[in-house]
């Protein structure tokens, strides 16, 4: 199981590096004003400075460090923890949290990509929100 956790950690770090690289590579191309909030229909309804483009990568980094490394508490598990199942339950908890983090980081990257594309006028001015919301039901 440690191999799976190590693979998942590597995958999370890869997503973080891709998110930060994409942001830094496109920052100088962005106009001074970019969309920073989108309504439920996916259309931008608030605009702000291009420095807001760093909000999602910073939140992703905080999410990775604060949630990814604070899973070792055994007092919040839905089953009784015994000496026999302690290690297995810990691995299951770590896998669950890291999988959710991976999904959220992927959504952050998708939103970042759409914000950059809309700002550079490479795509239509909406984010397809429905598929991300429906994806939450499969977690």
Model segments located where?
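Short, basic/aromatic recognition patches
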Residues: 4-29
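Active-site and channel-lining beta-strand-loop segments
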Residues: 23-54
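Alpha-helical transmembrane segments of multi-pass integral membrane proteins
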Residues: 109-139
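Alpha-helical transmembrane segments and their helix-start/interface "positive-inside/aromatic belt" motifs
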Residues: 1-13, 48-57
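Membrane-water interface of transmembrane alpha-helices
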Residues: 21-31, 64-78, 106-113
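Hydrophobic core of alpha-helical transmembrane segments in multi-pass integral membrane proteins
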Residues: 13-22, 57-69, 133-139
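Interfacial helix-start motif at the membrane-water boundary
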Residues: 43-61, 92-98
């Amino acid at each position: 199981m440690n191999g799976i956790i190590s693979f998942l950690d590597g995958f999370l770090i890869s997503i973080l590096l891709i998110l930060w690289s994409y942001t830094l590579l496109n920052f100088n191309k962005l106009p001074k004003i970019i969309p920073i909030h989108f309504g439920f229909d996916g259309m931008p309804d608030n605009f702000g400075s291009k420095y807001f483009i760093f909000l999602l990568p910073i939140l992703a980094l905080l999410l990775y460090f604060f949630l990814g490394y604070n899973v070792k508490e055994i007092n919040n598990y839905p089953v009784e923890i015994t000496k026999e199942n302690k290690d297995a339950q810990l691995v299951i908890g770590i896998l669950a949290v890291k999988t959710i983090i991976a999904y959220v980081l992927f959504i952050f990257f998708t939103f970042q990509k759409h914000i950059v594309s809309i700002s550079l006028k490479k795509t239509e001015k909406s984010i397809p929100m429905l598929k991300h919301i429906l994806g939450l039901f499969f977690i």
